[in-house]
Each structure stands twice: as C-alpha cells, then as structure tokens.
A protein has these predicted regions:
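Carbohydrate-active catalytic/glycan-binding domains of CAZyme proteins
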Residues: 1-502
Length: 502
C-alpha cells in the first residue's frame, strides 16, 4: 500500500477546489488579504503537489487596498472546459464576485469579469446542453440562507435569469461552498454547512433536474468531525470538492484544522485528501465513514511525505510562489537577487496598509526559521523576523540601529496587549543571525553575531496567535521578514528546518 500524509498541502491553504485535465490535477485555495491571490497547485498523482504560481498576480486583478483582516479573496472554484481554465471567486473587499480565465495554466490569467450577484463561494457548472450555471450563497425573501443558482453568460458575466434557491441544506448554519456534478444522470449538489469552525460539515443532495427539487443524502453529513473527541488529528472538516481520477476512482479535497493545544489552532485551515466510493444507491461514502487521520493509505507503493525543510537564497529576480505579501505591495521597496533587500516604510505590521513584509505560511508546529540580516538606517526604524497572523496578533524579533551596533528586542502584540522587551545590544556589528524556533505551544526568539553564538531574546505563546483568540479570522500564521521606518535590511537567506530532527 501507499502511505500519504494529511494535510497534503499544510499551512493556511483553505477552501480547496480541484479539477483534472487528462493526467494532470490543478488545485486552488483562498488567499484573503495576502498577495498574490489564489495559490495554484499541480499534481500528477494527487499525493505530490507543487505550487506553480498564483491565479491573481496583478493589482488590477486583485485590489486589496485597506482590506480588513480576513477580507479580500474568499473561496475559489477552478474548472476546465473546451480548452480553457476558469477560476471564479469573491473579493469581499473590492468588487464582489468575478471570474478570470486562461488558455495556458502556467501563464497569465485574464482581467476579472464581474458578475452582478451578492453572496460568496461562487461555482460554475456546465450542463450537457452547454448552459453554464452560477451557484453561490443566497438568501430568500425571508432572509433564510441557501444556495442560489442562475444561468450566466461567460463572455460578459451577465445573468441570463433570476436567482433561484435550489437547496437550503440540512439545517446547519451557513450553507455555502456549493459545487454541482452530473454523474450517471443525477445532478449532485454538494455544500458546506455548520460554519467553518468546529461544527463544520459537508452535505450532499441530488436531483434529476439541475433546478431540483434536491433530495438530501440519507447519511448526511458525508464528512464531519463535529462530534469527534478532542484527541483526533483534525477538526473543523468541510468545504470540499470532488474529482474523478483517470482510473475511475473518486477523491475529495477538503480543509480541516490541526489544534495545537486543547481546541486552539494557529496554522490555519489546511488541504486534505480523502478517498470516495459510491454505494449501491448512488451516494458517496467518504473515507469509509471514518475520521481523517494524519497518515492515510491508498493503492500503490511508497511513503509520500510533504517537504518540511528548505532554504531560499533569493538568487532569482522575483520571489518563489510560496512567498506572500500583505495586500498590494509597493514593489519599489523590494529587491531580489543576491539576497533580499527590504526598504522600510511608514506602514507597520499594526496597520491595515501595505507594510514591507514577505513571508511564508507556517506549515508545521515544530520548525526552525533562520536568516542573516544586515541593517542600516534611522534609530527609530526596525527590521527582522515576524510570526504574523493579523495586524492585531503578531510577534517580532526586531533589530534597530544603535550607536555601537544593533539593538535587538522581542515585540509582542495580542489585540490591546503589547509588550517590548529590554534591548540587547550586539556591539560593533551591522549583521545578525536571527532565528525563531517554533513548537506546538510556544515560539523562542534568538539572535547573535553568527549561528554558533545565539542568545535567547524571549518567547511567545502560540495560544495568543490562535484563531480562537481572535475576532473572526480565516487565515493562519506566517513566518517571514519585515522592515518598518527609514531603514534598509538585507537578508542573505531564509531557511526552514524540521525541528523534529534536532
């Protein structure tokens, strides 16, 4: 048997949607206030995934100015039809629902085509007669939420009919994330319910007509951990999409969370892979109705593990796809090649602007982040490493220029609680090695003139950066580099090591 690891895409990569073209699978995730938008992944076997870019790479496609925390890009759907890829999503901060398209999955995507429809979580379905249907969240005249549908013109984005609610779900709150599939003469409508927290679930219904009425699956929900005991590997399972492999087997991608301590999580909602079978009555059975586990088995041979350790020396003239900016970046403040140079600005990590910030998603609990930084500038400026979740929840290992060297401090913010440690001055140097050691329950921040002479500057609890300690956030923790104020910081490298191997 083949053993693979869940999550297949770890870290803040929620709301997965998938399609297959021949032997190739493509998957996208939501990205909220981070830029570029909608991470784009490729696989040949569903187990090994490579990020090949993003769908939304231009400011004109993705305006995020002054976007609130967990604003921006919500759940996307990716589909392929007649030689063309389509990605439809919602920018809840600027513009609403829209789709883009491309004929080259590794190339540029079109400008947005906006659709005059409220709600979130849009999806597209092509019927046998060529009619294209839009589905998404919608409320009826009494305010009851459900899934709305109407035919749409993909040339213009124009609605070709009125919105009709085709299913209200099974009674769980927040019916959302709809996808329609036509399988063996049935129209299957699969949705998420229960909210994206610990009551999350996936349900399905079917009809002989695309307009319904839809019959609910007798064993709904088809996926959930809402009743699971605390010790299971994952919670908040839902928001799924289905794909058929070339061999006729079916698979589901969905997201879930990994609690770090008790019922708190800080790495965000992560992408999972589950096998699907169809029972004698034509209903899907997901993962044999068992709980999702960190180690899964499938037909084949091998042991598939996600990459935990890597290093970036920033030799290219642009960041690799794994890197993210916060909102639309001022590109004049970033220089790549022979390391990374950041020029600070007036925007800080406390603001809803576009601070000088480049980071990657935290993908495991036990990791070691390290960089070598050279800093020059005004004494009030700061640069260094950050663990960032939102503008109100972040920790920084920062350095400031001092008369005789560099002064290092640990800055911690959790809503209105802010602390700044006493400065530790490293004499006669403008260069430091900075390290963050991540564990399940805490971060340890270290600095020194080189990697063999590091000094602990302080620690910070992961609990205060957990989603459950925040006011409505759908993202997860990032680790990376920043610069604030009048300064220039040069980073020779950024490395991530699997701390389990230490």
């Amino acid at each position: 048997m083949l053993t693979y690891e869940n999550p297949i895409i770890p870290g803040f990569y929620p709301d997965p949607s998938i399609c297959r073209v021949g032997e190739d699978y493509y998957l996208v995730n939501s990205s909220f206030e981070f830029f570029p938008g909608v991470p784009l992944w490729h696989s040949r076997d569903l187990f090994h995934w490579e990020q090949i870019g993003h769908v939304l790479t231009r400011d004109s496609q993705l305006p995020l100015q002054n976007c609130n925390t967990s604003g921006g890009i919500y759940a996307p759907t990716i589909r392929f039809r007649d030689g063309r890829f389509y990605m439809i999503t919602t920018n809840v901060s600027n513009g609403g629902n829209f789709f883009v398209w491309t004929d080259d999955i590794r190339g540029e995507w079109s400008e947005p085509v906006y659709i005059d429809q409220g709600g979130i979580d849009p999806s597209l379905f092509w019927d046998d007669d060529g009619t294209v249907y839009y589905t998404g969240t919608h409320s009826d005249e009494n305010g009851l939420p459900g899934i709305g549908m109407f035919p749409v013109d993909l040339e213009t984005g124009a609605r070709l009919g009125e919105t009709k609610i085709i299913w209200y779900g099974t009674g769980g709150k927040c019916p959302e994330g709809p996808h329609i599939y036509k399988i063996n003469g049935w129209y299957y409508l699969m949705i998420a319910e229960g909210g994206t927290e610990y009551g999350h679930m996936e349900t399905i219904a079917r009809s002989r007509s695309v307009w319904g009425p839809y019959e609910s699956c007798p064993h709904n929900p088809i996926v959930t951990h809402r009743n699971a005991h605390r010790e299971v590997d994952f919670h908040a399972v839902g928001h799924a999409d289905l794909v058929e492999a070339p061999d006729g087997k079916w698979w589901m991608v969905c997201h879930a969370i990994r609690p770090s301590v008790f019922m708190l999580h800080h790495t965000g909602r992560e992408t999972m892979l589950l096998p699907v079978e169809w029972d004698e009555n034509g209903w899907p059975v997901v993962n044999e109705n068992k709980y999702i586990t960190a180690e899964m088995q499938a037909e084949g041979e091998g042991d598939v593990r996600v990459q935990r350790s890597w290093r970036d020396d920033f030799t290219a003239d642009a960041p690799a796809p794994r890197w993210a900016y916060l909102r639309n970046p001022d590109r004049s403040r970033y220089a790549f090649g022979g390391g990374l140079t950041l020029h600070g600005s007036a925007d800080t990590l406390d603001d809803l602007g576009a601070p000088t910030f480049l980071a990657v998603r935290q993908q495991q609990f036990a990791l070691r982040y390290e960089t070598q930084m050279q800093l020059s500038g005004h004494a009030d400026a700061a640069a260094g490493l950050t663990i960032f979740h939102t503008n109100e929840h972040h920790y920084e290992l920062l350095a400031r220029p001092a008369e005789s060297g560099l002064a290092v401090q640990l800055r911690r913010r959790a809503v209105d609680m802010q602390t700044l440690s006493e400065p530790v001055v490293f004499e006669n140097t403008g260069t430091l090695v900075l390290r963050i050691e991540a564990e399940r329950m805490k971060y340890t921040f270290l600095a020194g003139p080189d990697a063999s002479r590091l000094r602990v500057i302080g620690t910070g609890s992961t609990q205060l950066l957990s989603t459950e300690c925040m006011n409505c956030t759908f993202t997860g923790c990032f680790a990376g580099m920043f610069a604030e104020g009048d300064c220039t910081a040069h980073f020779a490298y950024f490395s991530v090591e699997d701390a389990r191997e230490a």
